[in-house]
Amino acid sequence: MARLERDTLRRRPDELSGGQQKRLCIARALAAQPQHIIFDESFSGLDVTLKKQVLDFLKELQTELQISFLVITHDLDTAMYMAGTIHVMRRGKIIETLEHPKSFSDFQEPYSQELVKAVRSKRRALQ
């Protein structure tokens, strides 16, 4: 299920890769057979390649096990990739809800648009 080799269970956490550690945490959560799992900034420390692998793995699990995820993130790219519904919050209140957004242009609230601008400027800086 978590795509971990058997010897992983005998290894210490510091002997596991970042991806193995994340998958082990997910496997531990799945052992309780939940209907919902909350991921609170769970992907922020991962490099782009590893993050994509973990997110793809989660999407497969979501389909296979019919469970829902609540993904709390400051990363709009992750939100767009994972979410069916996105709630944008500011100062503890939901200010915008998007159902199955297709692109960043779907965001309409001024604060949401500022977040999108920040993502775009970060992308330009990295190029």
Language-model segment annotations:
Residues 33:
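Conserved catalytic motifs of ABC-family nucleotide-binding domains
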Residues 79-81:
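A short, surface-exposed alpha-helical micro-motif characterized by mixed small hydrophobic
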